[in-house]
UniProtKB/Swiss-Prot annotation:
The active site is at residues 230, 232, 237, 408, 410, 415. Keywords: Cell membrane, Lipid biosynthesis, Lipid metabolism, Membrane, Phospholipid biosynthesis, Phospholipid metabolism, Repeat, Transferase, Transmembrane, Transmembrane helix. CDD domains: PLDc_CLS_1, PLDc_CLS_2. PANTHER family: CARDIOLIPIN SYNTHASE, PHOSPHOLIPASE D. This is Cardiolipin synthase 1. It is found in: Cell membrane. It catalyses: 2 a 1,2-diacyl-sn-glycero-3-phospho-(1'-sn-glycerol) = a cardiolipin + glycerol. Its EC number is 2.7.8.-.
Amino acid sequence: MNFGFLGTILTILLVVGFITNVVLAFVIIFLERDRRTASSTWAWLFVLFVLPVIGFILYLFLGRTVSKKKMEKNNGDELHAFEDLVQDQIDSFDKHNYGYINDQVIKHRDLIRMLLMKQDAFLTENNKIDLFTDGHKLYEKVLEDIYNAQDYIHLEYYTFELDGLGKRILDALETKLKEGLEVKLLYDDVGSKKVRLSKFKHFRALGGEVEAFFPSKVPLINFRMNNRNHRKIIIIDGQIGYIGGFNVGDDYLGLGKLGYWRDTHTRVQGEVIDALQLRFILDWNSQSHRPQFKFDQKYFPKKIGDKGNAAIQIASSGPAFDLHQIEYGYTKMIMSAKKSIYLQSPYFIPDQSYINALKMAANSGVEVNLMIPCKPDHPFVYWATFSNAADLLDSGVNIYTYQNGFIHSKILMIDDEISSIGSANMDFRSFELNFEVNAFIYDEDIAKQLRQAFEKDIEQSKLLTKKVYDKRPLSIKFKEGLAKLISPIL
């Protein structure tokens, strides 16, 4: 065996690996610095240093950013009307010329004004909201609304499993296709990894349209696996909408290994449907290879039915956005709280500024309550969540671990006045990497319903104390330390 030759090959590979690492480090530090937080940059440099070649491969799958141009393709001049609406609302707030009937709109005008800096986050009024915390009740209503649809049905989901629940919904959609309705389904290619377009052959033969978000172009390999569409929305006839945390699948009915699935979702009616419809059209056009999905008037009809009193903004965020509106909205709400804060999130891995905001609120006398799962669905994420939550104990934050199955709810509510419900977790992935959508709701009734639901959850939770946390074994401390170190890339 020619060991000299093998040594030469090994040397060449090491040199190539070193040069590749240096180039990639240069890209991360300088060329993508505007799209990354400092913690993310350091985390990736750590991975490259510890795992020179493997780190490069991981970066190809997990580290690349998303082009804003790609996400805004096919929309042309269609957005001008919404941009004008947002600018008019900004002007009215700047001139203190409100004209709104909802007291919470005036009281929290600073939050509203901030969210308006993204063109799809226009303020809507006269909205009716129904709250769901149980998957069975939610999807009974969803199926009823689908069967009652008259014109079109649009669905966008991170996970759309074709199991018992998924097949029931697909059957309902195919029934409406036979009646001549328009049906569009956008699912995430990684979140719905068991599903392929070929599974929708009959659905498409009936005239249904289906698209996968950032699909893999190479079998078993997806170079966009770290930037996923985590949104969960439905629009029916431009009159009814759904937004929240529930995906489609039997797991979300409590039939999976994690047991009972506790989540939060809303059914909405009113002006807010136009905002959900806009979000769907933008996302569909970013992925579809078909002719542009037009902003036809039929998708933004005059609203009928009972009017509610809630004001709502639909805020979106994602790696192609200049502003992280949901993260900003969460932080602004926390800093605005005067009496109480209620938080639920399955994954709690925010940056230090978010942690500090909660500490400052608690140290200022605000009652801060955080609820997280007692069991992991992703081990590293779980330990990072636990470690971050425990950091708040010294400030007097109440930390609850939910015991009755798995809590997947993503809500923030302050002062029994305003709340946020949607797909975004309180973590780096939701704030920086995934495409998310949340409803910021200015309505005391919904806020109080969320508090009541939280208090009911407390009955099935354990309070985490400093005394108990400090007694955790060394193995747990090691897991937490490692998970926290790599949390910016989890």
